[in-house]
Structure formats: C-alpha cells, structure tokens
Design a protein with these regions (language model features):
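Short alpha-helical basic/polar micro-motif
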Residues: 222
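Bacterial Sec-dependent N-terminal signal peptides
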Residues: 2-38
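Catalytic metal-binding/acid-base residues of hydrolase active sites
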Residues: 72
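Extracellular beta-rich repeat passengers
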Residues: 27-28, 36-43, 47, 53-60, ...
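Hydrophobic or amphipathic alpha-helical targeting/insertion segments
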Residues: 91-103
C-alpha cells in the first residue's frame, strides 16, 4: 500500500509540475540596441530593438535592409542632418504589425527635426518642361525618373515617422515624413503614419506606386502631395487630421503637363481642426487643391472643417475643392479628367468647387462632382500603429 501511495504522489507531483511549466509565460525578448550609420553597403537585418540613427543613412543599390516589428529608431537633431534614404536598386523591408509598429521618432519631439524616409526608384515621371527625369529637391541632389514601372523599393508595413520635415544642406531643401521619387508599383506601402512633420505628410514625385491605409496627422504643409505625373491607381483608406498648422488636405499637381494618367484614391477622410492656420503667406485652407494640370479620380470622401475663418487681421478661405489656375480648369476640369465622387461635406464654407484665382469660372461637367449623405471615408482599425502616447490619431 505504501508503495502505491508513493507512486501516486510522484505521478501527481509530475502532473502539477508539468502544468506549471507549460503555463509559465514566455519571457519577452530583450530588445537589441545599436547605432545605424551609413552608407549601408551590405544586407543588414535589425532585430527587434531600440536604435539610434545618425546622419544621412543611404541604403545602396543591391542592398536590402530589414527592421523587425516593434523596433524604435530615434534620431537626435543635435547631431546634424539625418534621414533614411533608399537609393534606386536598394530595398527597405519594414515588418511592423498593428500592435507592434516600427517607429522612427526624434529626441526633442519638435516638428522638422530630421529628413524622414526618402525612397528613390526608376519608375516613369513627367517633370516640368515635359522631361522624364529630374533632380531631387531634398538636398541629396539625386536623379530620378525612368521606364521601370514595376520598380520595387521594398515593403513598408505599419511604420510611423514622427517629427520629420527638416531642411537639409543649404537650408532651403525641405523634406517630408515620407518622400517617394519615381517609386514603382512593385513597392508595398501599407499602414503608414506621418506624424507632426514640418512639411508634407506624404509626397510623391512621379512613379507608379500606390499606398493603402495611411494617416497624415498634424503636418505643417499638406497632408498628401504629389507632382511630376504620379500614376498610383490602387490607393485606398487615406486619413488626414490637420491640427496646429497646415495648408491643404491634398495638393495635386502634374508639373504643368497636360496628361491623361491621373491617380485614383478611394475612401478618403480629410478633417481640419477649427482655427488651424496655414503656413505664413497663404490664406487658403482647401481640402482638395488642384494646380499645374493636376487631375485624378477620388471617391467616397468625407470633408470636415474647411470653412472660412478670421484670425487677427487675416481672413482664411476654405473650400472642398479649389482650382488654382485657368490652365488646370480648361484642360482638366472641363475635359472631365478631375472627378470628385460621393463626398460628404460638413463645416466647410464653399461646398462646390471654386476658382482659387481670378479670371476664370469653375463649372465641373455633370457627374464629375457629386455629393453624398452616406459617404464613409477612410476605414481604418485603431491600435498601437495609429496611436501616439496612448492617444488615437483617428478622430
């Protein structure tokens, strides 16, 4: 009997021991640390961790750089000019998730403290004067443009860039949170956040890449901006919240080239906080501003907060759509190359398209500007990727 009792006790102990071991939580991985400098001339993978980026870090052609989910990369403007630059032929793979985004931030938390993420490719561009290539305006002075529509610069998934938009080199070259020069359709841009930069949230210079699930929050210039014949057509779920200071929800231009390959964006929300003033020297606060032959098709839109207001001696004029020059009106509006479809408008003074200058009248052809009471705008899931310091960016 004693032998049986002992055997039973041993078995019971082993059972509970086994349960206890299997139920123990898996310890969190220890974050790696390190410094990121350039140029990066060989493939490099950065494990989950906390890193410091110093200088203009260029990823050379033929090189792939990867960041794991949950990593934080900190920049210090006191070290000088800083940016992460993907040269044509290089690839940047960022594998963030909704709960563990990869965050690029700056120590002082001051807008305009670094140059953000800049990517170059050789997809088609149509630059001023009708040419197919130009030199970047970011201070790097790098040529962009080409014929490789499917250029692949990597994949950016669940990435947040904070406090970018700095002027580089000569003090006149402004950058954005995300800047794409002739980036091609082989590149993935998904679940990206541009937070409190001193210039645009996102800017495209030509190229064929599309972007999905994007948030532009509190950027000083435009939430979304492009030129040089950007041709992305698979864009969806774009959300902008303009607070503190900001120009337009979207600034749309084609470098004065009359073309027929306008971009397409579906599911758009453009919101502007009351009293949010534009940069010095401008008095327009438009949701959509078209100029220099800009065009495209935009659908299922919410526009809120683009109303006229006065601060001090300055009166600001808001509109859902503003056409800034006669050429754009003649070549793009009148030929139905601009379509604003199913837009729900609130707290906005000019609810029909207006002329942003004198000497012409804007009248969209039938069916090219339509309003709706049921438009839903961008559909984005909340989470760590869309939050800063615990506060959601989706208002």
């Amino acid at each position: 009997m004693k032998t049986k009792i002992l055997a039973l006790a041993l078995a019971t102990g082993l059972f509970f021991n086994s349960c206890s071991s299997s139920d123990d939580p898996t310890p969190a991985p220890t974050p790696a640390t390190g410094e990121i400098t350039g140029p990066i001339t060989a493939n490099k993978s950065y494990a989950y961790g906390n890193y410091t980026l110093k200088g203009i870090v260029k990823i050379n052609s033929g090189v792939t750089v990867t960041f794991d989910a949950g990593s934080t990369i900190t920049i210090d403007k006191a070290t000088g000019d800083n940016a992460l630059v993907v040269l044509n032929g290089g690839k940047l793979i960022i594998n963030g998730t909704a709960d563990k985004p990869v965050v690029f931030t700056e120590k002082s938390k001051v807008p305009g403290s670094w140059g953000g993420i800049i990517m170059y490719g050789d997809a088609p561009a149509k630059v001023a004067g009708g040419g197919t290539s130009s030199t970047s305006e970011d201070g790097n002075n790098i040529s962009y443009g080409g014929s490789n529509a499917t250029h692949n610069g990597g994949s950016l998934n669940y990435v947040r860039v904070e406090y970018a938009g700095s002027k580089l080199a000569d003090g006149t070259k402004e950058n954005n949170a995300f800047t794409f020069y002739s980036v091609g359709s082989g590149t993935t841009l998904d679940h990206l956040v541009a937070y409190k930069g001193a210039d645009d949230g996102f800017e495209f210079f030509g190229g064929t890449v599309s972007m999905t699930n994007a948030i532009s929050y509190g950027n000083y210039d435009d939430a979304f901006d492009w030129q040089d014949g950007w041709q992305g057509t698979a864009n969806t779920n774009w959300y902008a919240y303009q607070t503190g200071k900001g120009n337009y929800g979207m600034e749309i231009e084609a470098s004065a080239n009359d073309n027929s390959f306008g971009p397409k964006v579906t599911n758009i929300t453009l919101k502007r906080e009351a009293g949010n003033v534009p940069e010095v020297g401008d008095n327009q606060v438009d949701a959509f501003q078209f100029k220099r032959e800009g065009n495209g098709e935009y659908s299922n839109i919410i526009v809120d907060g683009y109303g006229n207001f006065t601060t001090g001696a300055t009166t600001y004029q808001g509109a859902v759509v503003s056409i800034l020059d006669a050429a754009t009106n003649t070549h793009q509006v009148n030929t139905s190359k601009i379509k604003i479809l199913n837009v729900k408008i609130s707290n906005t003074t000019n609810v029909t398209p207006i002329a942003g200058a004198t000497g012409f009248t804007v009248a969209f052809p039938a069916g090219t500007f339509t309003t709706s009471t049921t438009a839903t705008g961008a559909s984005l899931a909340a989470g760590a990727w869309a939050s800063v310091d615990g506060a959601s960016l989706i208002k």
